[in-house]
């Protein structure tokens, strides 16, 4: 299920990628073996070629202003998605990425995933954890609860809970996910591709969630690599989010009753 806004423009990316797929926590150790290889990139704007249908559902990628009791710092909450809030994935359990600004105190945040069909909204999962923010986090969808179907539209949202008794004032951002079925040609190309080539393919095909997660994986493995940092800056600039490109990256770790951001 893909909604086209305009013809695609070419994208050329060459990067040293040391992870095979996009599941960040599972693949991080493999990336650490060679993530420091040189990389060069040329990223062109084209991610907005896909947009969700008019369902009436929200689509905010930046927290923005609020009259709630939320601290002013919370308004910088940002979903790392294209301007249309729409991104594609080939994964049944993709990783979403968002920036959580530094908060004045530890606060509760919530992450939910909803299946959307016409005017029907079916909740699939909800997670909550405590954080003081201050980083860009890579947050995988829970495999045990959330397996995305091809052709089904999904919406995820992430909120900073400012008043547990009245969540209408929460700072909320979110994005759309469209899981696509790759063609046999694309599948074969990825199966035979080196990690470097796989990232190039994701980007060439404008598969946002997989491309962004792959690059985030590299940066997590080599946070001091200046070339990877520049590639990350270019990627975020291509969707108008260059202002948060220098924030440190973190993954998510979880226990049955608690979740937290771990650098």
Residue ranges and their predicted role:
Residues 102-111, 117:
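Solvent-exposed loop/turn segments flanking beta-strands in beta-repeat/beta-sandwich domains
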Residues 37-56, 68, 86, 130, ...:
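Extended, polar beta-sheet/loop recognition surfaces of beta-rich domains
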Residues 218, 223, 229-263:
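Preference for solvent-exposed, low-hydrophobicity sequence contexts
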Residues 96-98, 136-176:
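Extracytoplasmic/surface-exposed domains of secreted proteins
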Residues 75, 83-104:
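Contiguous beta-strand segments within globular domains
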Residues 12-23:
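Bacterial N-terminal signal peptides
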Residues 214-216:
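Inward-facing hydrophobic residues that define packing positions of alpha-helical scaffold repeats
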Residues 122-135:
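Solvent-exposed serine/threonine-rich low-complexity stretches and specific carbohydrate-binding patches
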């Amino acid at each position: 299920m893909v909604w086209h806004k305009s013809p695609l423009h070419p994208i050329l990316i060459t990067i040293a990628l040391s992870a095979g797929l996009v599941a960040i926590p599972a693949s991080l150790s493999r990336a650490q073996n060679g993530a420091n290889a040189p990389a060069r990139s040329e990223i062109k704007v084209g991610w907005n070629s896909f947009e969700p249908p008019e369902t009436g559902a929200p689509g905010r990628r930046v927290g923005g202003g609020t009259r709630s009791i939320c601290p002013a710092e919370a308004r910088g909450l940002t979903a790392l998605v294209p301007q249309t809030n729409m991104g594609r994935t080939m994964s049944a359990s993709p990783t979403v990425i968002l920036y959580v600004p530094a908060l004045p105190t530890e606060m509760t945040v919530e992450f939910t995933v909803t299946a959307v069909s016409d005017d029907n909204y079916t909740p699939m999962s909800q997670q909550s954890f405590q954080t003081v923010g201050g980083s860009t986090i890579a947050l995988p969808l829970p495999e045990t609860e959330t397996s995305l179907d091809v052709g089904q539209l999904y919406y995820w949202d992430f909120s900073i809970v400012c008043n547990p008794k009245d969540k209408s004032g929460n700072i909320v951002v979110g994005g759309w996910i469209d899981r696509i079925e790759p063609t046999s040609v694309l599948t074969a190309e990825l199966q035979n591709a080196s990690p470097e080539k796989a990232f190039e393919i994701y980007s060439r095909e404008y598969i946002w969630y997989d491309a962004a997660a792959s690059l985030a994986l590299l940066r997590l493995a080599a946070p001091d690599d200046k070339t990877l940092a520049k590639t990350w800056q270019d990627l975020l600039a291509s969707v108008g989010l260059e202002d948060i490109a220098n924030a440190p990256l973190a993954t998510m770790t979880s226990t049955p009753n608690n979740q937290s951001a771990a650098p």
